[in-house]
């Protein structure tokens, strides 16, 4: 069993925060038949982590951070996802290699237009959201090996040839992990958004 782990990092930076959604992305799965006589007996796994591409919202007069506790003028929204990202088969239809894509999508960071860009409070709120980013990335990194092992355990038991029903079984495993990642992420980020943390943020910028 081989697991290869790659990171897809956005050049513009990636943000994540307390307003979350879970999604198991269903897409057309590319399946390639490869005649590789030197393959190992067990399938290989390739995992890519996607940190997402953020959209910044600051000019929106209708500040909407519903669901974010003690946001203090800023919040983020993000969708967690996990999906099959390609399958290579042997000539007899057994899985030789399977790819997974695990990450964040539809990432938005919103800061109230009442906070002037470059002001002390604007910078403090932005710094707070960047800390949320670090927590989200740790969730992805933490769960990726466990997800890979769980999917491989399922794949190794699948009889050839691979069928759509079997692919759906893998999707179900991925969806369960998306829910788990979301729950753990919520717990970790809620610790950052306590009343004490909110008061500390406000105290950094006395009028």
What are these model-predicted stretches?
Residues 1-7:
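Bacterial N-terminal signal peptides that target proteins for export
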Residues 29-113, 154-207:
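Metalloprotease/metallohydrolase-associated module, dominated by Zn2+-dependent proteases
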Residues 104-106, 117, 122, 126-127:
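Extended, surface-exposed interaction regions
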Residues 124-136:
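Active-site recognition of the HExxH zinc-binding catalytic motif
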